[in-house]
UniProtKB/Swiss-Prot annotation:
This is Putative transport protein KPK_0013. It holds the Pfam family TrkA_C. Residues 192-276, 279-361 form the RCK C-terminal domain. One of its GO terms (cellular component) is plasma membrane. It is a multi-pass membrane protein. Gene3D superfamilies: Regulator of K+ conductance, C-terminal domain. Coiled coil: none annotated. It comes from the Bacteria. Belongs to the AAE transporter (TC 2.A.81) family. YidE subfamily. Keywords: Cell membrane, Membrane, Repeat, Transmembrane, Transmembrane helix, Transport. It comes from Klebsiella pneumoniae (strain 342). InterPro entries: AAE_transporter (IPR050144), RCK_C (IPR006037), RCK_C_sf (IPR036721), Transpt_YidE_put (IPR023018), YidE_YbjL (IPR006512).
Length: 553
């Protein structure tokens, strides 16, 4: 068997063993995709014992390409919501998550100085303790840029593997200790979250109001500031027994019933101006009006604003809602359309069909991956990651690297959505497949490289002390911030658990947090809010630590 064929076969074996280990769960918690690392260590140990030679250049390429795939697909997935998460609504969550990252870096620095831990080892312990694989890749790359020998850099993978198991367990233990310490009732926390999120930014509501303000009589809808804003959409108007789709120039009359869509606080303000809410139904059933969901797939409308389509004037159709990446938004006239957006249309069937044809509504296109934008994004990301940032007094230039560059570029492209006929939408199933493939390849190689000396390090070397250092790096930041967030900020427990999981970019911890309450989405929401920024910081932190430690030594 050729060296290349042998290398591929061994990697496949690592993936099989590792994924099997990851699927083993104890009390509902397992290593998940992290099991591939341990599969690599096991196979790597026996490969080393047997004296089998694998292709080092090929392993190195597979490791780096796997990392690029992983971080790029993460960026594309969370890009649409990343910049929104940095606004005021997620500021508090992100500040606490940043504090966890900073404390982790400080604990790592203190341990490095107190116990004189070798730089590659302490960076590996840090990456494993915070369960962040891209941090491992970023740390290895900066060490190579600093001229550290390859065999020394590979120690990072070994120390990462030592610290990784408690990294996962430590998050779960912190959630449990916070719950125990504050005597938290999860059911009540879920109820409080639902009550508070009634005014949340992510939920759209509808109300039917009667026009009671005499100043609005015979006024065109477009002249009513409340109804001509980007915060509320008036999708139906009922006058007597007639239900119609209102156009901007439609004159409203006293006694008209309006069906409004928007955020609760905006609807409340509209109610104060227009009139009281009524229980009368404005359902389209039994009328010639229909409500349908249409998907934007036509390349010709990508990037256009809703107002530029003129669907009200041309087709007598109203766009009442816009669903983007699972988040419902008000279909404001200034919103730009992106591939995969789902629009709620209200109008007559023939008019809706005409608008749907203009928007595309080709469901099969949602399952197709446009590969050209994928490789454009990866290429631009690698270029961005290769740009050196020279800081006076530092021995090496700081770079985003192969972990940070593609991630930042994917976040930007995911937010932009489309440029001309190129769109960066990726079907969730395709995104997940590429992401899983990337992380499996990366962890398989890291495990293989670490496996040869792993057992000896654990039984005869400093393996146990590395595990202890990892426990400190995991536990101190999580417990400190967990207690502060609950005690001082009075943060909802389920939201807190999601934030802790997101601050460690740890899907198994999110799964555990979600299982605390079956129907509450609090944990998932806070996880998604902090994840993008934390992922970026986790990639940058080991590079900063490496450059600082190297300069001081």
């Amino acid at each position: 068997m050729s060296e290349i064929a042998l290398t591929v076969s061994v990697l496949a074996l690592v993936a099989v063993v590792g994924l099997w280990i990851g699927n083993v769960k104890i009390r509902g918690v397992g290593f998940g995709i992290g099991g591939v690392l341990f599969g690599g260590i096991i196979v790597g140990h026996f490969v080393d014992q047997a004296g089998v030679a694998l292709s080092s250049p090929m392993l190195h390429f597979i490791q780096e390409f796997g990392l690029i795939l992983f971080v790029y697909t993460i960026g594309i997935q969370v890009g649409p919501g990343f910049f929104a998460s940095l606004r005021v609504s997620g500021l508090r969550l992100n500040l606490f998550a940043i504090l966890i990252v900073i404390l982790g870096g400080l604990v790592t620095a203190v341990l490095h100085k107190l116990f004189d831990i070798p730089l590659p080892v302490v960076l590996g312990i840090f990456s494993g303790a915070v369960t962040n694989t891209p941090a491992l890749g970023a740390g290895q790359q900066i060490l190579r840029d600093l001229g550290v020998p390859f065999e020394v850099v590979d120690q990072m993978g070994m120390s990462y593997a030592m610290a990784y198991p408690f990294g996962i367990c430590g998050i779960l233990l912190t959630m449990w200790l916070v719950r125990l310490f504050f005597r938290i009732n999860v059911e009540k926390e879920a109820q409080r979250f639902e009550e508070s999120s009634g005014n949340g930014h992510a939920h759209l509501h509808t109300i039917n109001v009667r026009v009671e303000n005499p100043n609005l009589n015979q006024m065109a809808i477009q002249d009513v500031p409340m109804l001509n804003s980007d915060n509320i959409v008036c999708s139906r108007l009922k006058r007597g027994e007639l239900l119609m789709v209102p156009a901007p120039g439609t004159l409203i009359q006293a006694g008209d019933l309006l069906h409004l869509v928007g955020r609760p606080e905006d609807l409340h303000n509209a109610q104060l101006v227009i009139g009281q809410e009524v229980a009368t139904s404005l359902s389209t059933r039994g009328t010639d009006l229909k409500v349908e969901r249409v998907v934007v797939t036509n390349e010709k409308v990508l990037g256009k604003k809703i107002r530029d389509l003129h669907v009200k004037q041309r087709y007598d159709v109203v766009i009442s809602r816009l669903n983007r990446a699972g988040v419902e938004l008000v279909a404001s006239s200034s919103a730009s359309l992106q591939f995969g957006d789902i629009l709620n249309l209200v109008g007559r069937q023939e008019a809706i069909d005409a608008v749907a044809a203009e928007l595309g509504n080709a469901q099969q296109k949602l399952q197709q991956v446009q590969m050209l934008p994928v490789f454009i994004g990866i290429g631009l990301g690698v270029l961005l990651g290769s740009i050196p940032l020279f800081i006076p007094g530092f021995p090496a230039a700081l770079k985003l690297g192969l972990a940070g560059g593609p991630l930042i570029m994917a976040l930007i492209l995911g937010r932009i959505g489309s440029i001309g006929k190129l769109y960066w939408f990726m079907p969730p199933s395709a995104n997940l497949a590429l992401r899983e493939l990337g992380i499996v390849l990366f962890l398989a190689v890291v495990g293989l490289k670490s496996g040869g000396d792993f057992v000896a390090t654990l039984t005869q070397g400093e393996g146990l002390s590395w595990i202890a250092y990892g426990i400190f790096i995991t536990a101190i930041p999580l417990l400190t911030v967990g207690i502060l967030a609950r005690m001082l900020a009075k943060m909802n427990y389920l939201t807190l658990c999601g934030m802790l999981a997101g601050s460690m970019t740890d899907p198994p911890a999110l799964a555990f947090a979600n299982n605390l309450h079956a129907t509450s989405g609090a944990a998932a929401l806070s996880y998604a809010t902090v994840y993008p920024l934390v992922m970026f910081l986790r990639i940058i932190t080991p590079q900063l630590l490496a450059v600082l430690f190297w300069g001081l030594s």
